Amino acid sequence: MNILYIEHYVGSPTYGMEFRPYYLSKEWVKAGHQVTIIGSSFSHLRQRNPIVNMDFQEEMVDGIRYVWLKGNAYEGSISRIRNILSFVWKLQRNAMRIAKQCKPDLVIASSTYPLDNIPARKIARLSGAKYTYEIHDIWPLSPMLIGGYSKYHPFIRVMQWGEDYAYKHVDKVVSLLWNAEDHCKERGLADGKFVCIPNGYNPEEWVSSKFDLEIPKEHQTVFDSLKGKTIVGFAGGFAASGNVISLVNAAVQLKNRTDVHFVMVGKGPELPSYEKVIEENKLTNITILPSVPKSLIPAINKHFDIAHLGGTHSVLHQYGTSYNKMTDYMLCSLPIVQSVDEPGSVVERVGCGIRVEAENVEAIANAIVKLADMSSEERKAMGRKGKEYVEKNLPWSKLAEDFLKPFQS
């Protein structure tokens, strides 16, 4: 099968995130498929962007053909919108060229925003290919709720037209969000066209030796000093979206539990607010450590007894979430306290932790106490449920196969 993957923000191991298109495409190439990914030369998500001198510049990455369209750099909203519109227009204008060169059997529109569905469908029609819309976030609902845009804003109205266009014409919707089907149907998607393919993991990155890698001396010294205590851990970015401040405030509530210690590993703009709470409350039951490379996350997580994953209040979370950090914790057999407004989340479905309301410090503290008061064996049994679920259901090889099944019948 020839697969054309349109992903404005596509990344790679060299450039950084976004990784999902790379991992799926790598598995498809292994299975004998031909994959072309079209992306923009500029993305705010990448660690570094490719040097692109002209449109349709090509690059081979692990057997995947990357095709770059030149895009303007951006920081603010206006220049980002210009970047989006330029990318979509170049696809639309060159649809015949792309169809002839790629000869796709399947066209995937996957650029977060829905406007790339218009050129994706055109290319599919010119090629006689199937066409699917891959949903990462629900647009334009996400920028409306997060950015405060009115539904009458011209940008939002254009994006709403793009979303509705996709649901009307698509052969299938592939969603990272497990509970988004009702929303899609409300906007016009026909019955039987919704498939959930969440984010996955690469087993090669989680071999047992990863857990034994040497971590920085500063980190090892802290963990050595906490032997005998129940460690509640978080490893990741200190951003407002992760609502780590609620975990810090839970440490305030549990400061008299001398058997429980909080360890946070990371960096980010919210760090000063955490340090302020720690200083004001004279906390001795929490330690903040510098971030570590992604390769050391298993070796860090193995020292935790309980993991925390949080979010802010958002109705968007009711449609489902797809946190890579969740998978990391589950692969480490950690029981999870998930403070996200996601009823029926994987934590609840699998039974690998406790889900509570987002930003509810008392509920977070109570969940931690409940897990801390379990025996070590009980916590490990709970954590193993998560690991077994991920290993069975979320290898990229399986997800890549599941992705193509609806288009191979």
Give the predicted meaning of each segment.
Residues 124, 377-392, 405:
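A short, well-ordered alpha-helix in the C-terminal region of glycosyltransferases
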Residues 4, 225-251, 263:
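Conserved donor-binding/catalytic core segment of Leloir-type glycosyltransferases
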Residues 96, 115-118, 122-127, 153-175:
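Membrane-proximal helix-turn-helix segments that form the acceptor-binding/catalytic region
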Residues 1-64, 254:
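N-terminal subdomain of nucleotide-sugar transferases
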Residues 242, 293-330, 337-348:
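Nucleotide-sugar-dependent
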Residues 265, 272-299:
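Nucleotide-activated donor-binding/catalytic signature segment of Leloir-type glycosyltransferases, i.e.
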Residues 41, 179, 200:
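Carbohydrate-associated surface elements
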